[in-house]
């Protein structure tokens, strides 16, 4: 579980399924994370520049974009390349996600266990790659 601290970490969650987005948001807020949720990618870059997240949780299959292309966009921009990204997907598995040269910091297949999500987030925020 995430440790309580006085330094709140900002997490941007981009997930098109409203129920999943709401659950992730509530769980992370209960663990003292500051969470911004988007259900499409259109506002991603402006939101990143505004909120400066410590982590982006990014669904691969969005109605308006492919999360892998968004990852490539983030990694290609010097102002966002340093931001850790956790990819999530119901369709893909860790073995069949094509990362190419732009690798995420982690991947979780949906449905995922809440403790696995929190452990993965905590690990990524402490510098680990999965």
Locate each region found by the language model.
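Conserved acidic carboxylate
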Residues: 15
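Two-component/phosphorelay signaling modules centered on CheY-like receiver
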Residues: 18-36
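Non-catalytic signal-transmission and effector/linker regions of two-component phosphorelay proteins
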Residues: 1-12, 115-130
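The feature encodes the CheY-like receiver
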Residues: 63, 81
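Acidic, metal-coordinating helix/loop segments flanking the phosphotransfer/catalytic sites
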Residues: 37-55
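Active-site residues of response regulator receiver
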Residues: 59
